[in-house]
Amino acid sequence: YGVFAREEDEPHCGVAIGDYVLDLAAAQSAGVLGYPDAGFEMPYWNDFMELGAEAWAAFRNDLQTLLTYDSPAEALLLPCLVPLSEVALHLPLVVSEFTDFYSSRHHTRNVSQLFHGVDGMLPPNWLHMPMGYNSRASTLVVSGTEVKRPMGQIKAPDVNLPIWSACEKLDFELELGAIVGSNTIMGEPVTVTEADDMIFGYVLLNDWSARDIQVWKNQPLGPFQSKA
């Protein structure tokens, strides 16, 4: 699932099928796809996510049926397929929150050594609860977006004052992102069983860290300017 646009179009929803994108707004106009409240003509999937898990599952089943070999809708669907080489991809969601979890044992130990010089140290609560912090939702961008080298305060261990400088230790981590597609009610916990039905999908993402800026800004409240 994604959002795409050709030069003459506004961004709207589509589904990648091999080397093509199925234009969902066009498929609706052709009469082969329902879901009038899904907002496929919009530049995000948020309207569709609000339909809930049952609609998500039904839509996926409908897609599989429509795209099966010798589908009766083949003649109507063919004009709705756009070559991937002809489109630009856009951020598929309006993201209000981005929580970054600290869930890899090896990564946690490596960062501990980087920041504190202690090899293999895990925080005492690490094995007992998911550790996370509010990251920068405003810095989420699609693949291929140019990344500027960050500027910030950097303090070397052997000097008293920080300097303003370009980052020299820009790090990135391949991560798995889970998209929460359902709203929660403040003050009401979500069970493990309920949580599974609230996940709309998964994405791969790169978490960028300006390590030399982060080591100075990290204490005592955690990363801020140094993360994207």
Predicted regions and their residues:
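Glycine-centered structural positions embedded in regular secondary structure
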Residues: 2, 12-15, 81, 201, ...
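Gly/serine-rich nucleotide phosphate-binding loop at the start of the catalytic core
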Residues: 2-72
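General structural signal for secondary-structure boundaries
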Residues: 23, 40-55, 83, 182, ...
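Non-catalytic accessory segments adjacent to catalytic cores
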Residues: 53-99, 103
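Glycine-enriched loop-and-adjacent helix/strand subsegments that border the catalytic/binding cleft
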Residues: 90-228
